[in-house]
């Protein structure tokens, strides 16, 4: 029975008669949809691009095994109608970033609720709600942590009012030449999967990087080693996949190439090993014989679940061989020109990455990892907890009822913590912050300054990495404010493609130039001021003035290393947006984007609302709230 009967009359009418939008039908989305219909919401639109996977079933309770492979949105609708058969639910198996879902679409709703798992889609929905002037409730969970906040144009800060932590990245030379952490080997193994079975990407090369600036070697010795490495085929002359095909995907030849010959070649780069422990090549025959010598030890029973056991080198070599054979068969079944896509839930693909990563860890003297640990790191999986999703979904509805009651001033940003804070609160409410006057999204006249080298940055970089990736536009049009309205980038396919390889300076862009970027879909215009600089750091293509540089600094890298599983957003193949392009970096993905880890809140440190850290020590700072009685939706633990 719907709870709306117990609500005040005006609120009950808004609940039963108003139309709301739920974006995402995953962990939070399933709980939220159930809560909405039980509260009495009768007109709900639900959108999600994902299909149901077996791994979803432990927490996304609207789905059953028989639903695997079907649309999440459609099945969620069918399941939740059993709670409220009279509800009018419209399911959309689509991306929220589809141009069909324009500003007019968003204006149909009295409230939008996000249950997303990636930053790109969050940014987009944030802008659409600002353009349509519709309240948005944003949410996220990560393990035991959760967060809910309200966004209203002109009243509160928007999702993009403050820079998000820069995603952790790894230089290509570290991945290929000098891995020092298990995650480096896991990234290398994922790259190797794509090089052998998937879509090849030059930025995901796995062979030794001869251009590494740290490397130095004797040319004659290197040439001799290179000859030995190339006896089975030079992967620099032909693609890795073509070379592997020419060997018939022979596991022993692949093993020898990757774990012996390439490692021997790395050893010729003597400068790399002056302050590092050098890697130790693996020989297939020796690995097999060592395994026989240790047979008695191998037969000893291991404690724990199979996926949580760390095997020996011989076992991983065998797993490597078996997984290659299985993947070779799968690739052949798909036909010529086919590609496989790495999926953490595909056993052969996971076997391949587990074995390859562990063999490389052993070579570089690291402790090997269990399949469970590697799966968590490879997919950046924070174990999802159903009760966390349930708590956050409940809070979303409570905040929604405040909005529909016309009491948005009573809305709060609410943090769910793993442990109670010093005031014994597990749920901590913080006052909503006003809009950031310098925000390049919700300010009255959005404007930003970008520092770059106009003689090096191309139009394609401006389009893909700055306008689309950094400023989250979907279909941008960019013109130069030069009095002539020169079109630099057009959203019409092919119209300005010839401009892509040209440098910005080729169009007269210099220090002080101004670009106007428009996204018709998002009803969003951004003025970009160009600040020319030739003093940018190594590998830094651009910086947003007042923002963090587009590179992981030492402190950021240190923080990320502490919480590699928690720093993700838009790099996955999200449920509501397209997959992002990958450079020579680790792109990590998570089930639900992580919320802030905040046991208290401070107005001076707004970044706490976005950043998730592992250290959950309670802060002594007071919440920026007036002294008041505990709200009803705050749990006090005595």
Curated annotation (Swiss-Prot):
It is found in: Cytoplasm; Nucleus. It is an enzyme of class 2 (transferase). There is a cross-link at residues 164, 236, 418 (Glycyl lysine isopeptide (Lys-Gly) (interchain with G-Cter in SUMO1)). ATP binds at residues 24-29, 48, 56-59, 72, 95-96, 117-122. The modification N6-acetyllysine is found at residues 271, 611. Zn(2+) binds at residues 158, 161, 439, 442. One of its GO terms (biological process) is protein sumoylation. The keyword Acetylation applies. Pathway: Protein modification; protein sumoylation. Pfam families: ThiF, UAE_UbL, UBA2_C. Keywords: Acetylation, ATP-binding, Cytoplasm, Isopeptide bond, Metal-binding, Nucleotide-binding, Nucleus, Phosphoprotein, Transferase, Ubl conjugation, Ubl conjugation pathway, Zinc. PANTHER family: SUMO-ACTIVATING ENZYME SUBUNIT 2, UBIQUITIN-ACTIVATING ENZYME E1. It comes from Mus musculus. The active site is at residue 173. Heterodimer of SAE1 and UBA2/SAE2. The heterodimer corresponds to the two domains that are encoded on a single polypeptide chain in ubiquitin-activating enzyme E1. Interacts with UBE2I. This is SUMO-activating enzyme subunit 2. The gene is Uba2. It comes from the Eukaryota. Its main location: cytoplasm. The heterodimer acts as an E1 ligase for SUMO1, SUMO2, SUMO3, and probably SUMO4. It mediates ATP-dependent activation of SUMO proteins followed by formation of a thioester bond between a SUMO protein and a conserved active site cysteine residue on UBA2/SAE2. There is a cross-link at residues 190, 257, 271, 275, 609, 611, 621 (Glycyl lysine isopeptide (Lys-Gly) (interchain with G-Cter in SUMO)).
């Amino acid at each position: 029975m719907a709870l709306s009967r117990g609500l005040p009359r005006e609120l009950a009418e808004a609940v039963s008669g108003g139309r709301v939008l739920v974006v995402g039908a995953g962990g939070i989305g399933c709980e939220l949809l159930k809560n909405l219909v039980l509260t009495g919401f009768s007109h709900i639109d639900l959108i999600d691009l994902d299909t149901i996977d077996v791994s979803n079933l432990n927490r996304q309770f609207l789905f059953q095994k028989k639903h695997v492979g079907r649309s999440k949105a459609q099945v969620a609708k069918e399941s939740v109608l059993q709670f409220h058969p009279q509800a009018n639910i419209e399911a959309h198996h689509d991306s929220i970033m589809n141009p069909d879902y324009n500003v007019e679409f968003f204006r149909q709703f009295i409230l939008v609720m996000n249950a997303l798992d990636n930053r790109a889609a969050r940014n987009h929905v944030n802008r659409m709600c600002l353009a349509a002037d519709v309240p948005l409730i944003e949410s996220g969970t990560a393990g035991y942590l959760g967060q809910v906040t309200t966004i209203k144009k002109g009243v509160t800060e928007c999702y993009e009012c403050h820079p998000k932590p820069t995603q952790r990245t790894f230089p290509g030379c570290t991945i290929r030449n000098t891995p020092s952490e298990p995650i480096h080997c896991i990234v290398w193994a994922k790259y190797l999967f794509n090089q052998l079975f998937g879509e090849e990407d030059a930025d995901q090369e796995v062979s030794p990087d001869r251009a590494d600036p740290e490397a130095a070697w004797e040319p004659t010795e290197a040439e001799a080693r290179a000859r030995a490495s190339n006896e089975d085929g030079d992967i620099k002359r032909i693609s890795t996949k073509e070379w592997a095909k020419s060997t018939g995907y022979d596991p022993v030849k692949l093993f020898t190439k990757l774990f012996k010959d390439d490692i021997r070649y790395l050893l010729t780069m003597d400068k790399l090993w002056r302050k590092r422990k050098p890697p130790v090549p693996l020989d297939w025959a020796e690995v097999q014989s060592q395994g026989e010598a240790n047979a008695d030890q191998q037969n000893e029973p291991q404690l724990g679940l199979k996926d949580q056991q760390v095997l020996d080198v011989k076992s991983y070599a065998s797993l490597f061989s078996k997984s290659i054979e299985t993947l070779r068969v799968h690739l052949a079944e798909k036909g010529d020109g086919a590609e496989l896509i790495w999926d953490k839930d595909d056993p052969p693909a996971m076997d391949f990455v587990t074995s390859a990563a562990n063999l490389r860890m052993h070579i570089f003297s690291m402790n090997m990892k269990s399949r469970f640990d590697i799966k968590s790191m490879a997919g950046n999986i924070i174990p999802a907890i159903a009760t966390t999703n349930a708590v956050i979904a409940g809070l979303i509805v409570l905040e929604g009822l405040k909005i529909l009651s016309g009491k948005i001033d009573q809305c709060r940003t609410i943090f769910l913590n793993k442990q109670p804070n010093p005031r014994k609160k597990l749920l901590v409410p913080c006052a909503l912050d006003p809009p950031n006057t310098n925000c390049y999204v919700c300010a009255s006249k959005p404007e930003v300054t970008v520092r770059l080298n106009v003689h090096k940055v191309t139009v394609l970089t401006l389009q893909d990495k700055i306008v689309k990736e950094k400023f989250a536009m979907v279909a941008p049009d960019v013109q130069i404010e030069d009095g002539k309205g020169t079109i630099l980038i057009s959203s019409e396919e092919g119209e300005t493609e010839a401009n892509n390889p040209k440098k910005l300076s080729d169009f007269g862009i210099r220090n002080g130039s101004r670009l106007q970027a428009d996204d018709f879909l998002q009803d969003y215009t951004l003025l970009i001021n160009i600040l020319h600089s030739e003093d940018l750091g190594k590998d830094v293509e651009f910086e947003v003035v007042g923002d963090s540089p587009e590179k992981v600094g030492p402190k950021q890298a240190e923080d990320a290393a502490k919480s590699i599983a928690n720093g993700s957003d838009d790099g996955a193949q999200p449920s509501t947006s397209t997959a992002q392009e990958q450079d020579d970096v680790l792109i990590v993905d998570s089930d639900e984007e992580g919320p802030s880890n905040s046991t208290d809140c401070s107005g001076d440190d707004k970044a706490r609302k976005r950043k998730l850290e592992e250290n959950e020590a309670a802060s002594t700072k007071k919440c920026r709230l007036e002294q008041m009685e505990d709200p009803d939706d705050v749990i006090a633990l005595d």
